[in-house]
Amino acid sequence: QLNYDPTVAPMDAYCLYWLVNLAVGVPLDGYYTDAANALGDKTPAEAEEVINTLKTLDFNTIDTVAIMYDATDYLSGNAMYSDENPTDPTQFTGNLEASIEVLQNYYPQIRIIVMSPTYAYAVDENGDYVSSDMYIYNGRDVLSTYVIKECYSANIHSVSFMDNLYGSITEDNADEYLVDNLHLNVKGRKLIAKRFEY
């Protein structure tokens, strides 16, 4: 069990790992109070609603949990994985794997579907949109490698994986579905929802 330190990275309180722990009943109220105090007006607008929902939702009544990452980890140059500790929640895939393990331990009956990021443009030093298959942040890797690692993490935990990077919003059609380099427009959201139905 890691301890959360709001003085280092207060936004981490809202990452998947800590939210899943909150959902299974780990008492984390102090974490979120500390995070909100540290973030001030940068606290996510929906934070209180999400926290209250996760604390009160009966996951014994839930059939399926869908987990969808966008390309923020790639765009931020966050660390992707650790061979020494594959469930290190400070890593992109470690956070996912640790979260899946918590859900599977507490609610083995729930089907978990991991949904990959859709395509997102990288932004170069001049502020121009460039291919995320060509641009690397913080010496990490390209967006497609994040997705490949995410798929691997889903597979080793025997959960479903939905590939949005190549299966829905791609480099070829991204202009039609994004409002900027990352965020989906209404048409893009509908496309992902339609694909999720299958």
Where are these regions (language model features)?
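Structural recognition of the beta-strand scaffold that forms the well-ordered cores
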Residues: 63-68, 111-116, 157-160
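The substrate-binding groove and active-site-proximal loops of carbohydrate-active enzymes
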Residues: 82-90, 134, 180
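Generic structural signal for well-ordered alpha-helices
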Residues: 96-100, 144
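Catalytic His-Asp segment of secreted/periplasmic serine-dependent ester chemistry enzymes
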Residues: 117-198
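Conserved SGNH/GDSL esterase-like catalytic core that processes O-acyl groups on lipids
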Residues: 1-86
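Hydrophobic positions in alpha-helices of CheY-like receiver
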Residues: 99-103, 151
